[in-house]
Amino acid sequence: MKENVAGALSYLLGPITGILFLLMEKESQFVKFHAMQSTITFAGFWVLDIALSFIPYIGVLLIPIVGLVAFITWLVCIYKAYSNEWFKLPVVGDIAEQQIGGV
């Protein structure tokens, strides 16, 4: 599989495909980076959604906004990975890079 396709697919189901590609990929730093960034980013969005669900009134208002931000982030990350770009999200991109051993 081409690196750009594998990188884009690592975002498809968020942390699920991110973890799968982390386990399967042994050589490509590009794929490992995008898989790690996907795992950290979208696991974070899931945790944030769960935390917001416990906050009365404001949480209900913020969950759709977080969902929209997550969806836009998801689309941008898939596009950038498919375009062979080492696109780093703020903060999360640096963490992902450190976790895979630097690029």
Swiss-Prot record:
Keywords: Cell membrane, Membrane, Transmembrane, Transmembrane helix. It comes from the Archaea. Its main location: membrane. GO terms for cellular component: plasma membrane. It is found in: Cell membrane. It is a multi-pass membrane protein. The keyword Transmembrane applies. Belongs to the UPF0132 family. This is UPF0132 membrane protein AF_0105. It comes from Archaeoglobus fulgidus (strain ATCC 49558 / DSM 4304 / JCM 9628 / NBRC 100126 / VC-16).
